[in-house]
Amino acid sequence: MSLAFIFAIAAECFALMLAGGGFYEVLVVDPVWPKRPELIQADRGGISRKRFWIPVHTAFELSVISALVAAWPAPAVRGWLWVALISHAVARVWSFVDFIPKALAFERADPRSITEASARKWTHRSVFRLPLELVSCGATIAAFARLARM
C-alpha cells in the first residue's frame, strides 16, 4: 500500500466528515438556532462548532496536500486531488471572508439582540458552501478509486 493511497484514504475520511458535518448543520442545527441563538453559543451551553470544524478542516487540508505530494507522479490522481483542494480552498476563503466573522458575531451576541431574520439570512447563504465540500468529497473518491486501480 503506497503512501499516496494511505493519504488519499485519510483525505476521503476527512472529506466525508466535512460533508456529514455540513449536512448536520444544514438539516439539524440551522433550522432551529435562528429562533434560539443560545444553541450556537458555547458560553451559554450551546454547541461549540469550532471544536469540530477546526480539527476536521485542518486534518483534511493536511491529508489532501500530503496525498497530492505523494501522488504527484500519477497525473490522473493528481488532477482529482487538485479539484478537491481547490474546491475546498474556495469554500474556506469564502468562509473566512464572509461566514466565520458573522458566525462569531452571532456566537458572541446577546441572544435577545439577534433577529430571526438576520440569522435565517445567514443560514440560507451558508447552505451554498455545502456543494463545494461535496465536490471535494467526490474528487477525493475519484482520486482514491484511481489509486486503487494502480
What is each residue range found by the language model?
Residues 2-16, 69-90:
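Interfacial segments of alpha-helical transmembrane regions
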Residues 142-150:
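Juxtamembrane boundary at the C-terminal end of a transmembrane helix
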Residues 54-68, 129-138:
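Core segments of transmembrane alpha-helices
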Residues 3-64, 100, 104-120:
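Interfacial loop at the N-terminal end of multi-pass membrane proteins
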